[in-house]
UniProtKB/Swiss-Prot annotation:
Positions bound to GTP: 546-547, 550, 567, 583, 589-590
InterPro entries xrefs: P2RX7_C (IPR046815), P2X7_purinoceptor (IPR003050), P2X_extracellular_dom_sf (IPR027309), P2X_purnocptor (IPR001429), P2X_RECEPTOR_CS (IPR053792)
This protein's name: P2X purinoceptor 7
GO annotation, biological process: apoptotic signaling pathway; bleb assembly; calcium ion transmembrane transport; calcium-mediated signaling; cell morphogenesis; cell surface receptor signaling pathway; cellular response to ATP; cellular response to dsRNA
Residues carrying the site annotation Selectivity filter 1: 342
Gene label: P2RX7
Amino acid sequence: MPACCSCSDVFQYETNKVTRIQSMNYGTIKWFFHVIIFSYVCFALVSDKLYQRKEPVISSVHTKVKGIAEVKEEIVENGVKKLVHSVFDTADYTFPLQGNSFFVMTNFLKTEGQEQRLCPEYPTRRTLCSSDRGCKKGWMDPQSKGIQTGRCVVYEGNQKTCEVSAWCPIEAVEEAPRPALLNSAENFTVLIKNNIDFPGHNYTTRNILPGLNITCTFHKTQNPQCPIFRLGDIFRETGDNFSDVAIQGGIMGIEIYWDCNLDRWFHHCRPKYSFRRLDDKTTNVSLYPGYNFRYAKYYKENNVEKRTLIKVFGIRFDILVFGTGGKFDIIQLVVYIGSTLSYFGLAAVFIDFLIDTYSSNCCRSHIYPWCKCCQPCVVNEYYYRKKCESIVEPKPTLKYVSFVDESHIRMVNQQLLGRSLQDVKGQEVPRPAMDFTDLSRLPLALHDTPPIPGQPEEIQLLRKEATPRSRDSPVWCQCGSCLPSQLPESHRCLEELCCRKKPGACITTSELFRKLVLSRHVLQFLLLYQEPLLALDVDSTNSRLRHCAYRCYATWRFGSQDMADFAILPSCCRWRIRKEFPKSEGQYSGFKSPY
């Protein structure tokens, strides 16, 4: 974008120039892309509700667990094992937890009658000893239950362990009971109350419907909106067995997903429940499998404080609430439409890729000559020429050369390094199509002798014999009319150029060269055409006419204005023009790069 230099530059608008190609194949490709993209954009707009402004849910959760369990516990009293029956209600097997979680006890181990005194440690690899030297007074092992006294005492039979100051007797290391003591907790139910709020949309609701049947139980298909869940059903949904998990405990996630459409015409805001096991199922390889913790019941007996230590195994239920609430918003709709408009450009990118590929030199040289089916693709070269304009960087070394006996133009973009320009190969570029509209503006003198149909001047010229080489003609001259350059030695190679690549007649002998380049009447007409009030005095007439003749030849032989700016005139043409419109002092500066 050009810089603004004045106030009028502010009130401008720029747009791209496009090329319209009338092609059944490319038209079909374009509409195929547009239909696919339009279908996808509409589908995503409706299915994902991308026209809505969405807001994350804010929620609070409250739970109530109900159920009664009968526990058969085996205890040892006076050396005799007894089976004790007890009943556990909600207060016995639930524990208060922070956040959106609740805990249900399913198994436990008891150590009764503990009091603070000295006693031997429970025998383990760490606590076994044979003498007092194996125990360190005051040592507190993180895995131990107390502080060592430095004595090694008898635990039972021949086993000796370090004596500790702790709650005695020390808790035994033993496995959780199998089956779980509260195996009937599978039939417990939990009521989940979930209130949600979307403050941005000023909308609040909850998961309990107004006419809820309090005797309902959640079922994935038959009763998916019931907020009362049976614990065994939760594990069944995840593919786990409640009885197996109840032995050592675990962690279960209850997911509540709210996908709320708050638009009046499609209002819907109901929760969707799902379940996920959150702890490690592979208890055999876990370092600490399951879920457990300890708590104590304190009491006094004979004025001595005692406690019953209980190691609790159970299931922690984490309630995870997430979701969004969306409502129609015109800004979101405009943003979405604007972001998808660029997708329609994929058709242009793909078609441009096909045109560029099928018009490449590789296809032209290696594919089209051998593949008959691919020959219709040659039309892409025409499309490419109409679509793209190749521009060469205007370096000081850029030069264009045109030989009358070649159909193409040669581009030389390198330093000559003393070599004659006639001998430099260069790169072949197509000759631009001639625009004959400007010829209609020339004076009628140019058309004095009507050409013979089918026999252009240049074709007649190539059939003539070469002009005999003069004694002054350089070795690189092919037409016999070139003269040595007057430039210094370092720049002389730039003017060592003939109008022909191979021996033949000189272009200066053609009738068209005389009428178009050397005709003083035509050149004066062109100068006045550009500047109607131009005063052609005697001193500047030859200079203006000479440079106008240079430009006429360059435009005639090179066609493109860009090429004409970097065109090098053959020595024969340059000296013929200089002879017709000479310089008074006879010294000429030669070619100068316009950039």
